[in-house]
From Swiss-Prot:
It comes from Claviceps purpurea (strain 20.1). Belongs to the cytochrome P450 family. This is Cytochrome P450 monooxygenase cloA. Glycans are attached at N247. Keywords: Glycoprotein, Heme, Iron, Membrane, Metal-binding, Monooxygenase, Oxidoreductase, Transmembrane, Transmembrane helix. Cytochrome P450 monooxygenase; part of the gene cluster that mediates the biosynthesis of fungal ergot alkaloid. DmaW catalyzes the first step of ergot alkaloid biosynthesis by condensing dimethylallyl diphosphate (DMAP) and tryptophan to form 4-dimethylallyl-L-tryptophan. The second step is catalyzed by the methyltransferase easF that methylates 4-dimethylallyl-L-tryptophan in the presence of S-adenosyl-L-methionine, resulting in the formation of 4-dimethylallyl-L-abrine. It comes from the Eukaryota. It is a single-pass membrane protein. Its EC number is 1.-.-.-. Heme binds at C450. Its cofactor is heme. The keyword Secreted does not apply. The chain crosses the membrane at residues 15-35. The lineage of its organism: Eukaryota, Fungi, Dikarya, Ascomycota, Pezizomycotina.
Length: 507
């Protein structure tokens, strides 16, 4: 045994020891944290999957790897563990006890949004600090007030006319109409109208706009982007992969937004103050330089475009597509709706008077039922238990615990909505509907209610009224017996709603 051999062996063992020590140093905190989460955490006695208690990666597994949506598992887990409260993460629980919705979302609630959940989000809905949220919402509120939204009806009518012309061209060419794309074009056009003081057209021809194609691609990776944002950025550098396409889509989306923003800013700086219409960009430029605190609380408009397009167009387009599917799948619902629209055809075809359209009772019932059954934002949106903790059933939750009660837990609660999986607009009409509006919660409730609620209702009411008043339509059957959807933070249909135009009743 030579001295050289001993020295070489010692050298190799030293490197082995260094590598082993490094691995242990990196892994030990994770192992210890996992042991704590499962066996010593204050939530250790809450029923639920052990893997969910161990790590938040369990939610990511369902949301992105399985691409099914973790929220779609909650009902099964509540049934499996026979409990109204389950542990869905190391520091998060979900409850089906509907009375806690009033506790969490009441006016003056001290239940703040969960920083750990929203840490990679931006924009209005992700703001945790109450002052920042109030400042930004107050800054934008006039754009989404009822009076301002009423003024958007002529713009929407013009877009609907263009869309109808395109649908008729497709019909004459023997093509089916992809309503998902038609509706996304309409809803995105409306939100861009508020974001920028420009006339941005997404509907000049029959081709789907590249901006919308890019946005759709981005939404397929939403959970990866908001959970581990650096991963897609790094993997996108690998040529030929789906992540490279993601990078290309992001570039396309960003280039359009930047170009619109720069053009808008330039025109407004060169114009008289009253010569451009109100928008996010105009309001930002109107901020006073000496109000530093307010300017700090309000993001640069370009930084919030994605959030408003996702929240202000994708959810509305999805919900409207679901409405088309359910109406056309139910002959009775379709007949009742068309009868009401025919009785008031002049306010749709001739006047396009939104103040009158919004008061049509059966149309409103159809929309409320669609919002209930389609669940546009289906997932967990955790709020933090305030100081003092809270007791849910037999379980005590300490301050700092994340608590969720999803829209699904309420919308499919049989005590509130009998036959919850059936599309029944009639449940929202007459004596049996008394008190039911309390549970029309698609836009949330309280001071954090969606700022775009009035805009969404304008689109839902006018789009459905216009198309069902004008066209006789039928589904092609591509969706089958039910719509398949997935939770990508907002709900996304896996099948586009395709239909045929049977007749144009206005010609």
């Amino acid at each position: 045994m030579s001295l050289q051999w001993l020295q070489q062996t010692r050298h190799e063992l030293s490197w082995t020891w260094i590598l082993l020590t490094t691995c242990i140093a990196l892994i030990s905190p994770l192992v210890l944290k996992g042991i704590y989460n499962v066996y010593f955490h204050p939530l250790r006695n809450i029923p639920g999957p052990k893997l969910a208690a161990l790590t938040d990666f369990y939610a990511f597994y369902w949301n992105w790897i399985r691409d099914e949506g973790y929220s779609k598992q909650f009902s099964r887990l509540h049934e499996q563990y026979n409990s109204p409260i389950i542990r869905i993460g190391p520091n998060n629980v979900h409850t089906t006890q509907v009375e806690f919705y009033d506790v969490i979302f009441k006016s003056g609630s001290k239940w703040l949004k969960d920083k750990s959940f929203y840490k990679y989000f931006n924009g209005l809905d992700a703001m945790i600090e109450p002052y920042q949220y109030r400042t930004y919402r107050t800054h934008l509120a006039p754009l989404y007030a009822q009076r301002a939204i009423d003024g958007l009806a002529p713009k929407l009518r013009s877009d609907l006319t263009n869309s109808a012309s395109g649908m008729m061209r497709q019909t004459k060419n023997g093509q089916t109409v992809n309503m998902a794309k038609v509706l996304r074009t309409l809803s995105t056009s409306m939100i861009l109208h508020n974001l920028f003081s420009l006339d941005i057209s997404l509907n000049d021809g029959d081709e789907y706009h590249p901006f919308l194609e890019a946005f759709e691609q981005l939404m397929t990776q939403s959970w990866l982007f908001v959970t581990y944002p650096m991963v897609p950025m790094v993997l996108s550098l690998i040529p030929g992969t789906s992540f490279a396409r993601f990078n290309s889509s992001y570039t396309t989306f960003s280039n359009y937004c930047t170009a619109w923003n720069d053009e808008d800013m330039r025109k407004q700086r060169e114009s008289e103050e009253q010569s451009t219409r109100d928008s996010h960009t105009k309001r930002y430029l109107s901020l006073k330089d000496d109000d530093a605190r307010k300017k700090t609380a309000i993001p640069y408009p370009l930084d919030d475009v994605f959030n408003f397009v996702a929240g202000g167009s994708d959810t509305t387009a999805y919900t409207t597509a679901c409405a088309f599917y359910h109406i056309l799948s139910s002959p009775t619902v379709r007949e009742n709706l068309v009868v009401e629209l025919d009785e008031h055809s002049s306010i749709i075809r001739d006047e396009f008077d939104y103040n009158k359209i919004q008061n049509l009772p059966y149309l409103n019932a159809v929309i409320k039922e669609t919002l209930r059954i389609s669940v546009p934002v289906p997932g967990s949106l955790p709020r933090i238990v305030p100081q003092g903790g809270i007791t849910i059933g037999s379980f005590s939750l300490p301050a700092g615990t994340g608590v969720s009660i999803t829209q699904q837990a309420i919308s499919f609660n049989e005590k509130i909505f009998p036959l919850p999986h059936s599309f029944l607009p009639e449940r929202w009409i007459g004596p049996k509907s008394v008190g039911l509006d309390k549970w029309n919660i698609a836009f949330s409730r309280g001071p954090r209610q969606c700022i775009g609620t009035t805009l969404a209702y304008l689109e839902l009411r006018c789009v459905i009224a216009y198309f069902f008043s004008r066209f006789d339509m039928a589904l092609t059957g591509n969706c089958g017996d039910q719509l398949r959807w997935v939770d990508r933070f907002v709900a996304v249909n896996l099948d586009d709603v395709e239909l045929q135009i049977l007749a144009d009743r206005w010609t």
